[in-house]
C-alpha cells in the first residue's frame, strides 16, 4: 500500500492519534503536513513530514496554514480531521469536572468541543476539498467516537461527536459526484501519551497504538474502490479486518461495539 505522490494533511497531529496517523502516512510514501499549536519532537528519518503551526480555533491561522500547504504542495489528496480541544482543562482547581452533569458544566467547555472539533473539521474541509474537486478524487477522514451514539460522561462531548458524524454524512452527499470519499473513523482505546500516563489504572489488553489508526487511514487511501464507504462510520479495528493489517506489535485489536463503551 504505497501513497507516493500523494499529499496528506493531518490536523492536530503533534501528538497522540494524529501523530500516529501522520507517521503511517509518511511511512507509506505520502508527503504529510501536520498541524498543531505545539512543536513536535522530530521523528528520526521522518523527512516526509512537514510541521505547520496552526491554532484551529483561529480562522486566520487556519487560512494561512492551508494557504502555505497549497502553495508548497499544490494539492491535497488526503485530509484527516483529527484536531480536538474537548479534553483540555478537564480539571478545575484540582477537581475533575469534565463528567459533571450538563447543568453544572461551564459553557466554555461546550465551545471548546465545537471550536476545536466539528467547526475546525468543517473549516479545514472547506479549504482542502477544492483541490480534490479539481482532480475528481480525494479522501476526508473525520476522527470521531462512540459518544456520537451513546452517552459517555459528558453531554457536550456526545453532541459534538454526533455533529461530526452528521458532517461526514452531509459532506459525503455533496462530494460524491466529485469522486471524493468522506468517512468518520472511530478508534478504540488508544495508547496515547495521556493514556499511558494512567496505564496502571486501565485495562490495555484490547488497546491500539496511534499508528493503528494511521494504518486504517492508509488502507482506505490505498483502496481504489474506497468510495463504497463514503458517508459511513467506520471502526478502525473493523477496517483492519477488512483490509488485513495488524497493529505495530502484531496484534489485531477486537472491534468495539456500543455494548463495550
For each feature predicted by the language model, list its residue ranges.
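Rossmann-fold cofactor-recognition segment
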Residues: 46-60
Amino acid at each position: 500500500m504505497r501513497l507516493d505522490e500523494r499529499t496528506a494533511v493531518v490536523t492536530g497531529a503533534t501528538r497522540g492519534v494524529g501523530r500516529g496517523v501522520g507517521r503511517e502516512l509518511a511511512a507509506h510514501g505520502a508527503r504529510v503536513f501536520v498541524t498543531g499549536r505545539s512543536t513536535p519532537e522530530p521523528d528520526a528519518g521522518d523527512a516526509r513530514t512537514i510541521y505547520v503551526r496552526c491554532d484551529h480555533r483561529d480562522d486566520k491561522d487556519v487560512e494561512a496554514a492551508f494557504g502555505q500547504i497549497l502553495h508548497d504542495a499544490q494539492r491535497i489528496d488526503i485530509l484527516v480531521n483529527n484536531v480536538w480541544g474537548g479534553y483540555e482543562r478537564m480539571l478545575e482547581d484540582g477537581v475533575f469536572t469534565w463528567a459533571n452533569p450538563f447543568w453544572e458544566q461551564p459553557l466554555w467547555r461546550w465551545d471548546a468541543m465545537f471550536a476545536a472539533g466539528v467547526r475546525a473539521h468543517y473549516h479545514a474541509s472547506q479549504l482542502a476539498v477544492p483541490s480534490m474537486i479539481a482532480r475528481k478524487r480525494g479522501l476526508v477522514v473525520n476522527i470521531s467516537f462512540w459518544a456520537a451514539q451513546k452517552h459517555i460522561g459528558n453531554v457536550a462531548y456526545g453532541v459534538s461527536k454526533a455533529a461530526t458524524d452528521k458532517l461526514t454524512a452531509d459532506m459525503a452527499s455533496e462530494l460524491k459526484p466529485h469522486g471524493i470519499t468522506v468517512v468518520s473513523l472511530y478508534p478504540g482505546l488508544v495508547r496515547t501519551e495521556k493514556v499511558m500516563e494512567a496505564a496502571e489504572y486501565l485495562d490495555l489488553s484490547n488497546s491500539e497504538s496511534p499508528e493503528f489508526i494511521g494504518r486504517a487511514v492508509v488502507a482506505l487511501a490505498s483502496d481504489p474502490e474506497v468510495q463504497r464507504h463514503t458517508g459511513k462510520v467506520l471502526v478502525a479495528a473493523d477496517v483492519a479486518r477488512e483490509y488485513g493489517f495488524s497493529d505495530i506489535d502484531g496484534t489485531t485489536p477486537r472491534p468495539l461495539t456500543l455494548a463495550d463503551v
